[in-house]
Amino acid sequence: MTDRFELVSPYSPAGDQPAAIDKLVANFEAGLAKQTLLGVTGSGKTYTIANVVQQVQKPTLVMAPNKTLAAQLYGEFKSFFPNNAVEYFVSYYDYYQPEAYVPSSDTFIEKDSSINEHIEQMRLSATKTLLSRRDSLVVATVSAIYGLGAPEDYLSLRLILSIGEHIDQRQLIRHLTDLQYTRNEFELTRGAFRVRGEVLDVFPAESDTEALRIELFDGDIEQLTLFDPLTGETLRKLQRYTVYPKTHYATTRERTLSAVDTIKEELKERLEQLYSQNKLVEAQRLAQRTQFDLEMMAEVGFCNGIENYSRHLTGKAPGEPPPTLFDYLPPDALLVIDESHVTIPQIGAMYKGDRSRKETLVEFGFRLPSALDNRPLRFEEWEARSPRSIYVSATPGPYELRESAGEITELVVRPTGLIDPVVEIRPVGTQVDDLMSEVHERIKLGDRVLVTTLTKRMAENLTEYLGEHGIRVRYLHSDIDTVERVEIIRDLRLGKFDVLVGINLLREGLDMPEVSLVAILDADKEGFLRSTGSLIQTIGRAARNLRGKAILYADKMTRSMQAAIDETDRRREKQVEYNLEHGITPKSVARPISDIMEGAREDAAEKKAGKGRSKSRQVAEEPADYRAMGPAEIAGKLKALEQKMYQHAKDLEFEAAAQIRDQIQKLKAASLA
């Protein structure tokens, strides 16, 4: 373990990267608050940021616009910094239905959610790392601006253990229960502890693979040992260990009882208001719901929807922002906003949507007014809490350009020598037939094609039409969840189909080197989906292939089209000059086709494998030759693979399950051959 970032990479900065790294580092060390990295597709933006992190040696928070991109970034930074604390902080809900009331139909919708325990563990690990290590890099989504427990409470509750320290066993057990750990003598699970004589085993909530054994003798801590909770194997002995709370929302008994008193006062004031307005039903509803919650909090220290009382539990004043992940960041940290043209507007939108829903709940007596303070940060609050920042995008928005005040670092030259796609404009009247002939040409070359339309209906019709003409085509739309979307992109890269049709394919920002043609239908319909930024992003999807080409179907040249084409041409010229100067022959990017989400799971899967055991992800590797296996061997292998596939599905690791499913199908085919 080290307190310094150590970048591990087989290659050195090239192209525009050395100058970009030097400029970003110099600006950061000079105290510049905001700067922008304008990096084209395939220019090595992540690698450039990794070099900046290594040089500035500051705790870093990287924000991404969605879980898919966050997982990809987590995997990349994990490979760049294998010896440092790279963490993952996203929403731990697999499914979330917020509490809501629809006055028009008098319908109250109860909160309903499903929490992913593995992601919860990673969130706890992220906050612990930020509080305890300087070499911490956290990849997060917009989840970072939502309320967490106050870091002061989180720190004040922690249990610090040292060898030789005198501690009463009952006191130790009481402290663990204050941290919301549960006693379980039968099975040691995450967030639980067990007592066997003078030995206590604790499975820390933020750990996935290591449990702590506390051995006492006559009231003194004699030994602290980390061990594998699955095998019982001793991993290492320690002089000191800190146990952090099981949840970010843990608080002391005194704070809870104090909150009960202030909630009662607020309830009394609110009921007086409702009675004065003759809102008797609302008053009766609020009194009943709140009094039930108060009884639960007084008796067990918890109630369903306790987050709605967070203002009272944290001691904040009305209207004050809640504590968030940004409160866990040290003041000298570095903030990186990836795909800032998407992430920045997201941050601004979160507060307003949350506010309108909760105002209805308060108005109709389902919640106290203090529930309005359980919210994401407002945009200006987020700005005030943000440390020195770097905005990263191929198409920075007006906010980033304004805030950077001219400090824009360009990353236009690709070390691979790849030039931006050739852009052609063709008439709308024959766009579908022309597209079909282009698709057939690309299929002959073994390449893939992306097609973007303006509407869902048009995408569906085009998919159906292409399918009827024997083209293997799929359609990507907003109703498809993240996991399935990732699988579709993986299948495109694997060649299970050749054409992907969508409405807004630029949002993914994912690497697809097999795509050599991007077709933009109705490119002259000015608007959000055909703005300059959107066009540049979409054209960039073909920038990782040597034969990259973009076709814009349009009958007239719009300002957005002209600006996008001019910018693409400028970048092409700069890359061509660099290639001639350095004698570089462009090559297509060769990126292994793997599970995109594995970045956020691979580390845990490796740890689960434990010392001396094979890595759990190796089940997806294909044996050299199935034909060499006998019938009994094949039957045994099939059974083992099926068990692993179902376990991955149970753990919500759908891409890993899909990989094993493909392997099972190949094994079955081999056994029949």
From Swiss-Prot:
ATP binds at G39, V40, T41, G42, S43, G44, K45, T46. Residues 431-597 form the Helicase C-terminal domain. One of its GO terms (molecular function) is ATP binding. SUPFAM superfamilies: C-terminal UvrC-binding domain of UvrB (SSF46600), P-loop containing nucleoside triphosphate hydrolases (SSF52540). It is found in: Cytoplasm. Gene3D superfamilies: 6.10.140.240, P-loop containing nucleotide triphosphate hydrolases, UVR domain. InterPro entries: Helicase/UvrB_N (IPR006935), Helicase_ATP-bd (IPR014001), Helicase_C-like (IPR001650), P-loop_NTPase (IPR027417), UVR_dom (IPR001943), UVR_dom_sf (IPR036876), UvrB (IPR004807), UvrB_inter (IPR041471). The keyword Cytoplasm applies. GO terms for cellular component: cytoplasm; excinuclease repair complex. Keywords: ATP-binding, Cytoplasm, DNA damage, DNA excision, DNA repair, Excision nuclease, Helicase, Hydrolase, Nucleotide-binding, SOS response. Residues 26-183 form the Helicase ATP-binding domain. PROSITE patterns: HELICASE_ATP_BIND_1, HELICASE_CTER, UVR. Residues 635-670 form the UVR domain. A motif (Beta-hairpin) lies at residues 92-115. GO terms for biological process: nucleotide-excision repair; SOS response. Residues 601-628 are annotated as: Disordered. The UvrABC repair system catalyzes the recognition and processing of DNA lesions. A damage recognition complex composed of 2 UvrA and 2 UvrB subunits scans DNA for abnormalities. Upon binding of the UvrA(2)B(2) complex to a putative damaged site, the DNA wraps around one UvrB monomer. DNA wrap is dependent on ATP binding by UvrB and probably causes local melting of the DNA helix, facilitating insertion of UvrB beta-hairpin between the DNA strands. Then UvrB probes one DNA strand for the presence of a lesion. The beta-hairpin motif is involved in DNA binding. Forms a heterotetramer with UvrA during the search for lesions. Interacts with UvrC in an incision complex. Belongs to the UvrB family. HAMAP family: UvrB. This is UvrABC system protein B. It comes from Xanthomonas campestris pv. campestris (strain B100).
